[in-house]
Amino acid sequence: LRPELRENKGTEHVGEQEFVRHGPVIRIVPARGKHCRSIGRRMRASDVTEVWRSGRVGPVEALRRSMRQSTAFTVLIDGRPEIMYGVGDLNVLAGVGGVWLLGTDAITRNWRWFLRATAEGLPGLFTRHEVLRNAVDRENAASLRWLEWLGAAFLMEIDVHGHPFVLFEMRKRRDV
């Protein structure tokens, strides 16, 4: 999910990327407020539960807050906003950022693309930070499996509003 590294097919779009692979047209663009409404109304159930448990807010407000507090992008699948993700500052001096991703059931429908794109795009999220952290609902099994697959380290269980969450981090990889 590194928009700056994707090859454009067609016209040039500053800050936008488009690619086609035997299926839907997928574009990664800077996140906008209207994307929050579109994704929020259709957010997958596990993400709706997680944003309520972590911040006591609904899906649209969770996306708006996350977008305001980070550099955020939206994944458009066939022109429709389906996934929003970003990285914000947690501790600038220590080089720690907060990474997040929320989406619709399009993640499940396009799981092969999603796994490949997130694995390929992960290094591009480390532009300002050496470490990326966040917490995930312990009951969100799919997200825990995905984070483990990406190489996240699970640090500890924490309590957030009476619900168990798992603190995770990912470190910038260095080529030796």
Residue positions per predicted region:
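A short beta-loop-alpha structural element at the N-terminal edge
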Residues: 24-41, 50
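Active-site rim helix/loop that mediates acceptor-substrate recognition in acyltransferases
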Residues: 51-71, 123-124
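Conserved beta-hairpin
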Residues: 70-88
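A conserved beta-strand-loop-helix scaffold within acyl/acetyltransferase catalytic domains
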Residues: 85-94, 158
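Conserved acetyl-CoA binding element of GNAT-fold acetyltransferases
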Residues: 95-108, 113-114, 166
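Conserved acetyl-CoA-binding loop-helix of GNAT-fold acetyltransferases
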Residues: 110-124, 145, 149
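C-terminal "cap" of GNAT-fold acetyltransferases
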Residues: 160-176
